[in-house]
Amino acid sequence: MIEKNKKAKIAIVGGGVAGASAALYFGQLGLDVTLFEKETSLVSGPPFCHLHAGGNLYREISDTQCVTLLKQSIDFLRFYPFIVDYRPTVIVLPLSDSGTPEALLLRLDLLTREYEALIAQDADNKVLGESENYYKRYDRSEIEVLKQQELVKTPKNCDEWMIPVAKNIDLNNVQFPLIMVQEYGLNLFRLAAGTALMLESLESVTLHMESIVHNIQKNCTNDAWIVSYLKEDKSHEESFDYLINAAGFRTGKIDDLLGAPCKAMVEFKAAYVSQWDGCDDTCFPEIIFHGERGTPQGMGQFTPYPNGFFQLHGMTKEITLYVQILR
């Protein structure tokens, strides 16, 4: 039981995006927070690159889930404005795909209205640009015109971002219109560095890096959590009023320590990095080639990085690392 006027002690296991964000949020409120991370730095788990501001990469999910993703993405950008890579995403449907661009447009219109309503509620929600510019469609005639334009070193509008797409995809094997949407990139390295700097500046937050939590017990006498952890080859023990399991895809290990196992699904998506000669100074948007999930024609994702590097990945059985559900 927490004594009256005594500050509650919170333990967070896992310093990934969720754990670091929770520690930062509670720390800014002045709560007593201790964050345990087994690696040498925060946000060092599986890489990410995309802000799903509307969930347009996932046709399989519902409209309600897409709206939820839009709202969560806006909240995330407001909390971490410094981690955005401001580049749009282009959505392409191959001729072989069973879907149509028109089906996507219905959802995009819904998301545009939802975004407009969120801006009306709070002007600070306008983090994806103007609502009327949330997405733009391009017919083939427009793409053919852009194909003849010179590349722009620093694109400032949708048309300039679309030029390298028009020049490099096979226009005879895709459906029109092509769609550009304001789903931005996320910079993993800025997030890791920024959260570390902010957390280190908070007196109410204690960071235990390179610390492995190996046991957690419930003290029924005072209703506290006893966390045992290894740091610098020594075992330590601390007592907390609240415990947050933020261990990411290793969440099940902490569940087992608590004696409270639960079912979970972990999906791993393979990714590869390649360098494209001659594209060092070309600013590409992200490009999504839709496909049927889990088939040889699964979605392909083309994510640009500086100096002509690109991350390539897709949802097919051949490159998905694990097929079975994992604990």
What are these regions (language model features)?
Residues 8-34:
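N-terminal Rossmann-like FAD-binding beta1-loop-alpha1 element of flavoenzymes
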Residues 18, 41, 250:
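Conserved Rossmann-like nucleotide-cofactor binding loop
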Residues 28-47:
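Glycine-rich FAD pyrophosphate-binding loop
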Residues 50-160:
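Dinucleotide-binding Rossmann-like beta1-alpha1 core, especially the glycine-rich loop
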Residues 85-98, 139-142, 149-153, 157-203, ...:
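Helix-loop-beta segment of a Rossmann-like dinucleotide-binding subdomain
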Residues 170-242, 246-251, 255:
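Helical element adjacent to the flavin cofactor pocket in flavoenzyme catalytic cores
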Residues 231-296, 305-308:
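Central helical "cap/lid" subdomain
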Residues 289-327:
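Active-site lid/adjacent beta-loop-alpha segment flanking the redox-cofactor pocket in flavoenzymes
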